[in-house]
């Protein structure tokens, strides 16, 4: 049985060299098809980017990324990553729909769905904060003039425009990525062990506040095979069984959270050994069905004696164009692209209507040509060209021109 080997990394915090050293060690023994990094990537290109990243001045350092950005080092395996809450937003805001940040390294944008070698991967960058969910992000040019500092702790908060196209997805997702945890997963794993490692989570767990309520709703709706997260700097596994289509939150209090202007980075060490593991996925259902069980995995950040990297082995759809592609290209997802276009046309409705009252299935059917033949060549993500990562605006304009106009 054919399976893809996918390396999964928790928070990066600029430690690309260490991550790729471990990936290369494993890759030399048994090849790895793809590396996924689950946020706090910190794509800092120069000193100017520090004005847009939530890192105290005494901890600011360029990190390893600049060597990849300047083509001094090449990533050893294809890499995709999502944004977290410690990102160079001055950089990533130029790529709202994703794009190359270096050779072999692709940012997924605020949200996305792509295909790679027969695996369908969805993503959502940032973290949940209720008070910013219905707000628009400021314009990059306005921020560049004088406002980065004033907005440094809200630019990475998830917006309704980020997540709406994901709620409209009708066909199954193999792997879903988010930086913070869906807030219901904690009740489906070994909570006692989690509290041994992170006792200060107890109150949030009791109140149903450890994580994002909106991604928990999305998990119950999409029912992916895997949901992967980071953010809380601890390894945690859970298994969520899906008996019925459900949008219900976990059976805990979901009262509104008071705004905290002093968000801190959780950073308590655990006594667990740093090691890699392999997990085998179960045999799949047919393409259009959703999975009866979602396996959740959260990983730590890249530090000694932490569990920050693991290998998943996943069975691909060998009938899909992305599997058959001889150049092993990534492909944008037609359903997600269609949803983006619909959301753009209905942005006034989405901004004025309560989120939980939107009929996502009905909305997704507007202007949809069900059963149409797909020209997958039209959705192939262009191959990397030298220094394209340094022309972020051109990458974004090309995407908008191709799909959004």
Curated annotation (Swiss-Prot):
The modification Phosphoserine is found at residue 269. It is an enzyme of class 3 (hydrolase). Its EC number is 3.1.4.-. Binds 2 divalent metal cations. GO terms for biological process: mRNA splicing, via spliceosome; pseudohyphal growth; retrotransposition; RNA catabolic process; RNA splicing, via transesterification reactions; sno(s)RNA metabolic process. It is found in: Nucleus; Cytoplasm. Cleaves the 2'-5' phosphodiester linkage at the branch point of lariat intron pre-mRNAs after splicing and converts them into linear molecules that are subsequently degraded, thereby facilitating ribonucleotide turnover. It also participates in Ty1 retrovirus-like transposition via an RNA lariat intermediate in cDNA synthesis. A divalent metal cation 2 binds at residues 40, 85, 179, 231. Keywords: Cytoplasm, Hydrolase, Iron, Manganese, Metal-binding, mRNA processing, Nucleus, Phosphoprotein, RNA-binding, Zinc. Pfam families: DBR1, Metallophos. This is Lariat debranching enzyme. It comes from the Eukaryota. Its cofactor is Fe(2+); Zn(2+); Mn(2+). Residues 242-277 are annotated as: Disordered. Belongs to the lariat debranching enzyme family. GO terms for cellular component: cytoplasm; nucleus. Its main location: nucleus. One of its GO terms (molecular function) is RNA lariat debranching enzyme activity. The keyword tRNA-binding does not apply. A divalent metal cation 1 binds at residues 11, 13, 233. Active in presence of diverse metals including Fe(2+), Zn(2+) and Mn(2+). Binds two metal cations in two adjacent alpha and beta metal-binding pockets. The activity is the highest with Fe(2+) bound to the 2 metal-binding sites. Activity is low with Zn(2+) and Mn(2+).
């Amino acid at each position: 049985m054919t399976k893809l080997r996918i390396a999964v990394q928790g928070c990066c915090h600029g430690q690309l060299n260490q991550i790729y050293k471990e990936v290369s060690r494993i890759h030399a023994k048994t090849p790895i098809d793809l590396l996924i990094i689950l946020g706090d990537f910190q794509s800092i290109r120069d000193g100017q980017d520090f004005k847009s990243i939530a890192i105290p001045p005494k901890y600011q350092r360029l990190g390893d990324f600049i060597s990849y950005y300047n083509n001094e080092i090449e990533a050893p395996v294809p890499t995709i990553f999502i944004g977290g809450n410690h990102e160079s937003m001055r950089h990533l805001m130029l790529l709202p729909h994703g794009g190359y940040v270096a050779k072999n390294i692709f940012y997924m944008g605020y949200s996305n769905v792509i295909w790679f070698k027969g695996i369908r991967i969805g993503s959502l960058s940032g973290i949940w904060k209720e008070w910013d969910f219905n707000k628009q992000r400021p314009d990059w040019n306005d921020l560049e003039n004088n406002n980065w500092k004033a907005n440094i702790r809200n630019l990475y908060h998830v917006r309704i425009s980020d997540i709406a196209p994901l709620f409209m997805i009708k066909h199954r997702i193999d792997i879903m990525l988010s930086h913070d945890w869906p807030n219901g997963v904690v009740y489906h794993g070994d909570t006692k062990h989690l509290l041994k490692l992170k006792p200060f989570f107890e109150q949030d767990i009791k109140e149903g506040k450890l994580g994002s309520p909106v991604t928990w709703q999305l998990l119950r709706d999409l029912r992916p095979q895997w949901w992967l997260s980071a953010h809380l700097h601890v390894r945690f596994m859970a298994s969520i069984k899906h008996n019925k289509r459900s949008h219900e939150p976990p059976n805990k209090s979901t009262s509104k959270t008071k705004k905290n202007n002093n968000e801190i980075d959780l950073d308590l060490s655990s006594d667990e050994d740093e090691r890699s593991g392999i997990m085998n996925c179960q045999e799949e259902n047919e393409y259009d069905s959703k999975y009866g069980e979602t396996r959740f995995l959260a990983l730590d950040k890249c530090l000694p004696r932490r569990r920050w990297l693991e290998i998943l082995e996943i069975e691909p759809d060998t009938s899909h164009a992305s599997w058959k592609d001889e150049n092993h290209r990534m492909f944008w997802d037609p359903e997600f692209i269609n949803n983006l276009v619909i959301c753009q046309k209905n942005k006034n409705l989405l901004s004025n209507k309560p989120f939980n009252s939107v009929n996502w299935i009905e909305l997704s059917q507007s202007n949809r040509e069900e059963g149409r033949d797909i020209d997958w060549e039209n959705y192939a993500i262009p191959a990397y060209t030298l220094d394209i990562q340094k022309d972020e605006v051109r990458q974004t304009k090309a995407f908008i021109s191709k799909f959004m106009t």
